[in-house]
C-alpha cells in the first residue's frame, strides 16, 4: 500500500511539472511573438478576439495561427508580461500585457487539459 501511495504521488508530481512546462512554453512563445509556437498549443477549435475585430467562435487551429501571426506583424509585437495565472479544475486562465509599438494591450488566454497537455481554447486581445 505504501508503494502504491509513493508511486501515485510521484506520478502526480511529474504530471504537474509537465503542465507547468506547457504554461512556461506558452508564455515564452508570447514573449518571442512566435505565432507558430503558440499555435502548437491551440485546441482544434479556438475562440479568438483580436484588437478592434469581432470575436470569431470556433476558429480552426491553422486559421487562428495565421490570424495571430498577422496580428503580431501588423502591431509590431515586441514582448509579453505575465500579470496573473489562475487554475480552476482542469481550466486555467492566463492574463498579461502584450507589448506593441508604443503601447500595451491586455491579453487573456483560457486553457484546458486535453490529451495530457494544456491547450488554448480562448484567446482575447483588447
Q: How would you describe each model-predicted region?
A:
Residues 3-28, 32, 40:
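Short, low-complexity N-terminal intrinsically disordered segments enriched in polar/charged residues
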Residues 24, 36, 81-90, 126:
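Exposed acidic/polar residues on beta-strands and adjacent loops within beta-sheet cores, strongest
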Residues 46, 90-92, 118-119:
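Hydrophobic residues embedded in beta-strands of well-ordered beta-sheets
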Residues 48-57:
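A short gly/proline-enriched turn/hairpin at secondary-structure junctions
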Residues 104-126:
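Short beta-strand edge/turn micro-motifs at domain boundaries
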Amino acid at each position: 500500500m505504501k508503494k502504491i501511495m509513493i508511486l501515485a504521488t510521484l506520478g502526480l508530481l511529474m504530471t504537474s511539472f509537465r503542465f507547468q512546462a506547457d504554461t512556461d512554453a506558452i508564455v515564452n512563445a508570447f514573449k518571442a511573438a512566435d505565432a507558430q509556437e503558440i499555435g502548437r498549443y491551440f485546441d482544434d477549435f479556438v475562440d479568438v478576439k483580436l484588437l478592434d475585430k469581432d470575436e470569431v467562435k470556433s476558429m480552426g487551429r491553422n486559421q487562428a495561427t495565421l490570424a495571430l501571426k498577422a496580428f503580431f506583424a501588423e502591431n509590431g509585437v515586441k514582448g509579453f508580461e505575465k500579470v496573473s495565472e489562475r487554475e480552476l479544475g482542469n481550466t486555467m486562465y492566463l492574463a498579461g500585457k502584450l507589448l506593441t509599438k508604443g503601447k500595451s494591450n491586455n491579453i487573456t488566454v483560457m486553457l484546458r487539459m486535453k490529451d495530457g497537455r494544456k491547450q488554448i481554447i480562448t484567446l482575447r486581445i483588447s
